[in-house]
């Protein structure tokens, strides 16, 4: 279901110019909260490490743990695996098969039955992320100073029943205690914590700026189902794009997807750069998604470090080319649709991949 009018009426909408000001390119040093499903794969760890290495541009006031889970893939993956193995592909199932063909191929090549793959629950994902956040701080010998918070253990099921937890409370209090400043929440996973905070205290739309990476460009006709960040919690995604909060949208597909890194680069620029460099190298060479999907030929593959796009925009907006356009709605079928009421949104359309990684590598190199 899309967001009910009764829910949207709780939000006092900002005028057009106020939203434009909120989504303007960041200048100087800004307060951010990193909202992250850190243990999901490996890109969040890169994003958090780069954030902690960028104190000149980022005032990291908190890190909030998000839930994550791939459980929504299980039934379709098993079904596609059986169809392909039994050679029963036809016009009625070809779309499903195409969605999972590369995953199934990896499992077949690795002799893995999808029925034997364990997918973390959202609650387990949140707790693993919380622990992983603390691990990154420890590896970098940085005191958390009570800046790490547990988040929601489940996805938003009812707009009338948001989840109060450490993360939502921290987001709310950060906004209310700094009314004259923008509070950027760099969301690099699902939007559960942010949506719950908005539903609990709608007043925070005044100075909350949601910087989110996910999905296809808002002008794309493609379905957003492939986006993990979006599809895990559809209600939360719909709420953020409907309630009037200021949004900087950084599409993963086509834009963030350019942030690839290779094993030779990891060897040359990351490995040996302090405990965190060695850990990032370990993650790259022991990627949990490689194991989950039966990826074997890692040597000649790159990996996308999606989530550093948020941090790149906060550090140097020119590295992430953006335009201001009308914010869309997200329908129940996960397509972007035209919104009746005009609200501006900043959206990424291009990226300076080399400058982004150069900054990251230089800062890591100082840890040698």
Task: Write out the residue ranges for each language-model feature.
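N-terminal acidic, glycine/proline-rich low-complexity segments
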Residues: 2-368
């Amino acid at each position: 279901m899309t967001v009910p009018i009764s829910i949207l009426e709780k939000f006092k909408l900002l005028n057009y110019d106020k939203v434009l000001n909120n989504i303007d390119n960041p200048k100087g040093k800004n307060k951010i909260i990193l909202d992250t499903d850190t243990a999901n794969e490996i890109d969040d760890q890169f994003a958090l490490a780069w954030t902690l290495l960028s104190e000149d541009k980022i005032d990291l006031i908190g890190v909030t743990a998000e839930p994550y889970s791939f459980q929504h893939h299980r039934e379709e993956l098993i079904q596609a695996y059986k169809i392909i193995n039994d050679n029963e592909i036809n016009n009625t199932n070809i779309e499903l098969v195409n969605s999972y063909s590369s995953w199934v191929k990896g499992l077949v090549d690795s002799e893995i039955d999808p029925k034997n793959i364990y997918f973390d629950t959202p609650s387990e994902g949140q707790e693993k992320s919380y622990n992983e956040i603390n691990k990154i701080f420890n590896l970098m010998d940085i005191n958390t100073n009570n800046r790490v918070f547990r988040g929601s253990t489940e996805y938003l099921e009812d707009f009338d029943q948001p989840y109060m937890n450490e993360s939502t409370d921290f987001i709310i209090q950060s906004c209310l205690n700094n009314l004259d400043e923008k509070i950027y929440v760099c969301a690099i996973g699902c939007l559960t914590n942010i949506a719950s905070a908005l539903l609990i205290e709608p007043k925070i739309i005044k100075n909350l700026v949601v910087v989110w990476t996910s999905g296809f460009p808002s002008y794309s006709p493609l379905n957003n189902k492939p986006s993990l960040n979006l599809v895990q919690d559809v209600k939360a995604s719909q709420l953020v794009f409907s309630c009037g909060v200021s949004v900087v949208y950084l599409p993963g597909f086509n834009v963030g997807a350019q942030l690839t890194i290779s094993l030779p680069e990891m060897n040359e620029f990351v490995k040996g750069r302090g405990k965190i460099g060695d850990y990032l190298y370990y993650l790259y060479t022991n990627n949990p998604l490689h194991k989950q999907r039966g990826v074997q030929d890692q040597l000649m593959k790159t990996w996308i470090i999606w989530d550093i796009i948020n941090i790149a925009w906060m550090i140097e907006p020119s590295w992430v080319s953006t335009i201001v356009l009308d914010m869309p709605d997200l329908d129940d079928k996960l397509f972007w649709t035209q919104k009746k009421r005009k609200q501006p949104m900043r959206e990424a359309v291009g990226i300076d991949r080399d400058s982004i990684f150069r900054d990251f590598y230089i800062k890591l190199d100082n840890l040698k």
